[in-house]
Amino acid sequence: MYEIRSAGPKGLGVFAKSLIPRGTRIFSERPLLSLRPDQSASDIYTLSRLLAPKDRQKLLSLSSHITTSLTFLRWNQALFYTLKSLFKNFPFLLPRYCHFEPHRPGIFQSRNSLREHVAILSIFRSNAFQLATKEIYQAVFPGISRINHDCVPNAQGNWSEGLGRFNVHATRDIRRDEEVSLSYLGDVAALRDARWGKLKDGYGFECGCEACDLGSDVGRKGERRREETRLLLGEYAESVGNGGEKCVEKELETMVKFIGMLEAEGITGREVASM
């Protein structure tokens, strides 16, 4: 149905090997690595060490967004983890390590281990989906993490509590050799510059999809639709926020226009179904 191969500057991507009809389930995966709501970033490396070697390699093969500031932050997190482990185990390990021998493994992580720790933190932060369920807060999936972003995606992911899996379905027909895409953003009505800002900060790239190409008629028309929709939503929210009487007709009119914008852009799925 699909294959994972080069997507140019984006790295690897998921492509249709044949026509994928709308509604087809493309992926159904259990988490490779996940955090519970009561866990934090300091638990990521510990959890990764519990993975089977094959799964650990799958995790380390995923790409990540790294900047100088993020690298500095994650090295600090890795060093803090090491120090915390040291002081936690200090009373038990002191007799064994009071005579330092350079050739013997110690309680400190080696430099390579610290590098791996930093890499895993970066990979998790770049690839994790925020599920925010009772059992799982964030999770990384081996195949789904290869799906790249598009502001007008052709697929959508949803977590199934019953199955314990993250499912990705086609929201429209996906042609042979077309790349499968998801939206990494929550605000579907955001303007191009706002979308770029969030994508640059969170993932390190500026989207080059059709909706972001303001040099094309499609891109310009889409941007105008989004501007008009945001203005309409803002006016409605302001009238209600200022104590204005809630008008069912006005609310319905606003929602119908919002749905019209989504449909004109080709955005389907939960965004329309939840209106």
Locate predicted features:
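Conserved catalytic SET/PR domain of SAM-dependent protein methyltransferases, capturing the structural core
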Residues: 1-275
